[in-house]
Amino acid sequence: YTYTHELGIQGMQKNLGLSDEQIVRKNNVDDTDALATQKAIQECIDEGCNIIFGTSWGYMDVMEQMAEEYPDIYFCHGTGYKSNGKNFTNYFGRIYQARYLSGIVAGMNTKTNKIGYVAAQDSSNSEVTGGIDAFAMGIASVNPDAEVYVKITHSWYAPEAEKAASLQLLDMGCDVMAQHCDTPYPQTTAQDAGVYGIGYNSDMRKETPDACLCSVIWNWSAYYTSEVQSIIDGTYDGKNYYGGMAEGLVDITDLADFCADGTQ
């Protein structure tokens, strides 16, 4: 997840011709620690930043408060739902579109009709549940006999829990492994077991060339470029952003050569 946002910032920087000195990064800021979040944002402001992107859900409330305190600075929060229509907006994407397509791929390549899904959060998180629903709908459109089995880690980044969840799903007979979590363990575990995987966030063929049927991917540079450009040229309108495949924000990778005949 963080890696794809970093690629997005790099893409924006290249597209707009910005120098390295114009980009300030604050990494590993605990989104459950409001003081740490506030400190990181304040440091950005003190270093002269006038556009601040926060990529984690937990930054939302602090960004909302600081947007009120600094009305001349643009605050853009990823994955959240709060905004003020002025200098505080939220952004995300129609990832369900790509999830649906990846479900079609999974449904056409399972032999056991059992498909595993390692999820970072439970049903209280609409981002995760919406992705599962879209994935399941894609599966059902081509293989109504297949079922999706979900294991929850209760953390966006929990390597050991993700590995354990993957092994549990394999023990249940799942032969395609999808995920909404931050490590490649569901994919590497699938490859080690000789079954297929559906990657997420970035192209996971790099880690699992023998298992990855396709990956659901983000191209965050599509958003970062358009948002920063709008501020530069004066067309910024304070609206929230919710792009999809049409905007080039979400997609799936090319299909693996070993996908079942007819997968398209």
Region locations from a protein language model:
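A residue-level marker of the well-folded mature domains of exported/periplasmic proteins
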Residues: Y1-Q264
